[in-house]
Amino acid sequence: MLKYWLGIVGLFVWGGCSTSFTPQEVKVIKEGGGIMRVWKTDNREDSLFLRQQAIELTPGEIRTELFQVLKQRMLATVNDSADPGVGIAAPQVGISRRLIAVQRYDKPGAPFEFYINPGIVSASEEQSLGKEGCLSVPDVVGEVWRSNEIVVRYIPELTSIKRMLSREKTDSTFKFEVKVEYRNTWEP
């Protein structure tokens, strides 16, 4: 019984620890509609911003209408017919939060799915070579070796931590979005 109550109290406390989006983030999320400006590495200010460590989203932020608007606008941006992508991270649209949208080629219809506070738990040693580009790195496409399978940890909108296995093209997109946007281990 004590474990039960501690669990409930823990969820309440964790759920109650809410920081807010900054006034600048609120402005970026709300301004305009649909497609957002993609921050680019060939712009000095954008590049410096993209290199910052992104902040984890809190349960309080995840439950806001603003979070839903951010997701809708990120999806519109990654699906922009003028510059489509297979993945996008919140920092790429000026929001320093750990949120990515990944096109799931391993699912029927290749839908986009969002992942909150993602992290790569493990990666297979077996790798494949594939072409990659990035919405934030204009006019650069290269071949990169990526693990064939990865295990990703993330928090779904319902607040429990989950793990999933990703394979092939989807795996490559996950690794790129998580590594580039949150670990700052790349050079443009």
Provide a role label for each language-model segment.
Residues C17-P188:
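Positively charged
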Residues M1-P23:
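Bacterial Sec-dependent N-terminal signal peptides
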